[in-house]
C-alpha cells in the first residue's frame, strides 16, 4: 500500500499510478528519523502521550530490526538498513541504503537503551 504522501503526488500528477516506487514504497530512513524523534518527544510529555510515542517508536524499531529492513552483516555495502529513500519526487536515492538512515536508527536504539536504564535520553 502506498503512503499518504505518495497518494498526494499521484493526485497532483507527479507520478503515474503504475510507478513502481509508489506501488512498493518503503523508506527506512524516514522511519528511523521518526523513531528517534518519537523517543525524544516522549521525554517531554507525560502519561498517555508518553506511552503512545514510546510504543510507536518501538513498533518502528522492531520493524526496522526485522530481516525485511536490516541487512545481513557484511552485505548491503556494510550499511545496517536497506530500503531507504532520498527523494521520490526526483527519483533520487530510491530503495537504497543511506548513511543517515543508519545514523538515526542507531540514535533511536541508544535513546531507547538510555530510557529503559532510567537515564536521560538526550
Regions found by a protein language model. Name each.
Residues 1-5, 9:
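Single conserved hydrophobic/aromatic residue that forms the stacking wall/gate
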